[in-house]
Amino acid sequence: MQSVGHAFKDALTAGSELAVIAEVKRKSPSAGELRPEIGAAETAIEYVRGGASCISVLTEGPRFGGSPEDLKAVKLAVDAPVLRKDFLTTPQHIHDASAMGADAVLLIVEDIGSVAEVADLQDLALSLGMDALTEVRAEHDLEMAAEAGAYMIAVNQRDNPKDTRFTVDHDKAVRMAGLLAELGPEIVTVAASGIETPDGTKLRDLAGVGYDAALIGEALVLSDSPAKRLQTMLNTLG
C-alpha cells in the first residue's frame, strides 16, 4: 500500500471517542423524500458545527437526490474531509471522485463483486491521494474486504435491497464487531445505516464494542437543528 495522505482516516481516528461521519442526502430508496430542499453546503456547515469529524455526500441523483455539484459545494464550505458516496465500480468513477475534490471514496464489496477489483480500486484511490472506505453487508463481504487489503471497513446494517427492500438490522454492527476485531486493531471500523433513528442503534453501543466511527444520515437530515441533534448524540459518549 502506497504511503499517501489519509485525511479522512486520520480525522476518524484523531480523538479518543467514537467519531461521526454526517451524511448529506435529500432522499433514499427506502424512506423516499427526506429533505429535498436542503442545501448541501449549508447542511455540511451545520454538521461540522455539531461535531462531525467527516462529511459523506451522496452524488447519485435518481435515488438519493445528490449530485457531483453537492460534493464540490461541500468541499468549498467546510474543512472536514469529504467522502463521495455513490455506486462506484470502475476506475473512471474513482478518477471522477478525485476531480470533484473527494478525500475518500466508498467501495461496496457486493456491487464491485471481486476481491481483485476491490483491491485495484482501493489502490487507485490511494494513488490519487484519497482514502477508500470499504462497505460490507455480511460475513462473506467482510472476508472479501480483508482479502483485498481493506484498511477501513464499514458495516452497512441495511440488507441487500434485492432481497429485503432495504430492511435494517439494528443489531448487525454489534454482532459483527468481534469479526472486525479479529482483523486487527489497525483496521478502522465504521457502522452505517439505522444509527440513532428512533428504534436504531445507539452510538454508545457502537463505542462499547470498539467501533471507531458511525455514519449517520437520516437521523440528522430529518432534524430541525442538525447541529444540536448531533451534539446531543455525541454527549451520550461522555
Where are these regions (language model features)?
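Glycine-rich phosphate-binding active-site loops on the catalytic face of alpha/beta enzymes
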Residues: 99-116, 154-165, 209-230
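Conserved, mostly hydrophobic/aromatic
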Residues: 22, 47, 55, 97, ...
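C-terminal helical cap(s) of enzyme catalytic domains, especially alpha/beta-barrels
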Residues: 172-179, 204-207, 220-238
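N-terminal amphipathic alpha-helix/helix-capping segment at the start of soluble metabolic enzymes
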Residues: 1-34
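Catalytic cores of alpha/beta
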Residues: 89-101, 137-149, 188-216, 228-229
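N-terminal active-site wall of soluble small-molecule enzyme domains
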Residues: 19, 32-133, 141, 173-177
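Glycine-enriched alpha-helix->loop->beta-strand junction motifs that scaffold or abut catalytic
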Residues: 51-52, 77-80, 99-105, 126-130, ...
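Active-site beta-loop-alpha junctions enriched in small/polar residues
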Residues: 23-27, 60, 87, 110, ...
